[in-house]
Swiss-Prot record:
Example GO molecular function: protein serine/threonine phosphatase inhibitor activity
Protein encoded by which gene: sds23
Source taxon at top rank: Eukaryota
Primary localization class, coarse: cytoplasm
This protein's name: Protein sds23
PANTHER family cross-referenced by the UniProt entry: AMP-ACTIVATED PROTEIN KINASE, GAMMA REGULATORY SUBUNIT, CBS DOMAIN-CONTAINING PROTEIN
Region (Disordered), start-end ranges: 1-46, 366-398, 433-482
Listed Low complexity bias regions: 13-25, 451-461
Function summary: Involved in DNA replication and cell separation.
Listed Basic and acidic residues bias regions: 462-482
Organism for this UniProt entry: Botryotinia fuckeliana (strain B05.10)
Length: 482
């Protein structure tokens, strides 16, 4: 059992958010392997030390104060239009090819979605394209998705076109991932309505001009949680919840789905699609959390030279994610995606905001892991070889035999016992404020039911061969399926 330590509420981040203004033309995105040639890693400290990771675990980043224009206002009466900006909107059309849309998605950044319209003159969204769609498309191209009998020819044609590098319009891709309909709100609606919707399990709201379907902004769960966190001192009803520990709030779920770090990355991609998840925990043989893989990480798989990664282990892919983040940030990075039952809500929200995550894994004290080697330096992690000549995929890529226990997370996290999501937190805020959100678990169940039909049927029968399903009911043992 974790120590009964109540963390003081960590300080808050600034409310200012960077603008995502991007040039109209989408530049060529070099592959991860190409970027490695300019990596300054050899001139940096080789890795984030365990002490530094523990410091991040205990003390998320510092605050710069809330926005004074919201001081003294009832958050429930703030209009949703006050939290969004048109610069967050990025459009593609139904006939835009998926390659262009993928580049736009990667380069646009948060809120990590491209809105789709019928013609370039429309300001009404008919659908969306995000990393869940990209993951579903990737599975089709790899032959790991299995459609209904009536769709077999369509899926086969898509895979064939992809192999031939033929243009594939978004209209042929956006139906691959099962998802809920677009949710819209007028910009004049109060935040109470948005909190109620988000607390019911909806992840994204399109904000429209009053009385129209003209989109003027995108409000995400993360943006709203960050707003309420940064301005918490102005909203006492919510601020008073932050010092409470998770165990006493009784939020989240004691059922979390994870994958062993030694399993193939393709298994993780299938698992996320099959379960309707945007991310999964990666664990070692003792169910200790060692990392996190999300559908957003599929952006590292969009170049031909990255294809060997698909046959690598999840733990190797995590090392690639950390290396890529280090190249972008100029330092090694090991984001902490876990909390414990005695973490405060403030501590949990601060981590969600700092890591831009949708969920935190709930862990208890670490379990001994068989054959756990010393934590390796990330500088020594194997990387994808840069292809020579025409840029073809190396015929025999080699990947290190790195155990799931080798990353820093295996030593400082703990045994996975549950998960807490942005939906859970916003559901708490809604209920505390007298609103009536739906149970977010019902929304999760719907996504999983609708997603399960899109994967190869044989996956269900072999699921136990690679899936670790962690059921953290108090007093029960961990169900480690091997």
């Amino acid at each position: 059992m974790a120590d009964r330590t109540v963390f003081d509420p960590p300080p808050r981040q600034s409310t200012s958010s960077p603008s995502n203004n991007n040039p109209a033309s989408i530049a060529h995105r070099s592959s991860f392997a190409e970027n490695l040639r300019q990596s300054p890693r050899a001139h940096r400290h080789p890795s984030f030390t365990q002490a530094a990771v523990q410091e991040l675990l205990n003390h998320p980043p510092a605050q710069k104060g809330g926005d004074p224009k919201f001081a003294g206002r009832d958050w429930r009466q703030i209009h949703v239009g006050e939290l969004v900006q048109e610069s967050d909107i990025h459009w593609c059309e139904l006939d835009t090819d998926v390659e262009h849309a993928t580049k736009a998605l990667i380069e646009s950044g948060p809120p990590n979605v491209i809105l789709i319209r019928e013609t370039p003159n429309d300001l009404t969204a008919c659908d969306s394209f995000d990393y869940n769609d990209l993951n579903a498309y990737l599975l089709v191209v790899l032959g790991l998705a299995s459609p209904d009998e009536a769709q077999t020819d369509t899926y086969s044609q898509l895979a064939s076109k992809a192999r031939e590098h033929a243009p594939i319009p978004l209209r042929d891709v956006i139906t691959l991932a099962k998802k809920e309909p677009l949710t819209t709100l007028s910009q004049s609606e109060d935040l109470s309505k948005a909190v109620e919707i988000f607390g019911s399990g909806v992840h994204r709201i399109l904000v429209c001009k009053p009385g129209t379907t003209t989109v003027v902004g995108i409000l995400s769960q993360l943006k709203l949680v960050k707003f309420l966190w940064d301005n918490g001192s102005s909203f006492p009803a919510i601020d008073q919840l932050y010092p409470t520990i998770l165990r006493d709030l009784n939020i989240g779920t004691q059922h979390a789905i994870a994958i062993n770090g030694d399993k193939l990355l393709t298994d993780a991609l299938q698992l996320m699609s099959n379960e309707g998840l945007t991310s999964i925990a990666v664990v070692d043989n003792a169910a200790n959390v060692v990392g996190n893989i999300s559908t957003a990480d599929t952006k590292l798989l969009t170049h031909t030279s990255s294809l060997p990664l698909l046959q690598s282990s999840c733990i190797h892919f995590i090392s690639v994610i950390l290396s890529e983040r280090g190249i972008g940030d100029g330092k090694d990075s090991f984001p902490v995606f876990h909390v414990n039952p005695y973490s405060t809500l403030a501590h949990t929200v601060a981590k969600l905001v700092a890591t831009r995550s949708h969920r935190m894994w709930v862990v208890e004290s670490a379990s001994p892991s068989p054959s756990a080697p010393a934590t390796p330096s990330l500088a020594h992690a194997s990387v994808v070889q840069q292809p020579s000549g025409s840029g073809s995929v190396p015929p025999s890529p080699s990947f290190p035999a790195v155990s799931a226990a080798a990353l820093p997370g295996a030593r400082i996290s703990g045994r996975l016992t549950g998960v807490i999501t942005l939906s859970d937190i916003l559901n708490l805020f809604a209920r505390t404020s007298g609103l009536n959100p739906l149970n977010p678990n019902e929304s999760r169940a719907r996504r999983r039911r609708s997603s399960s039909a899109s994967l190869r049927p044989s996956m269900d029968s072999s699921r136990g061969d690679y899936l670790d399903t962690i059921r953290g009911e108090r007093g029960s043992s961990v169900d480690n399926r091997k």
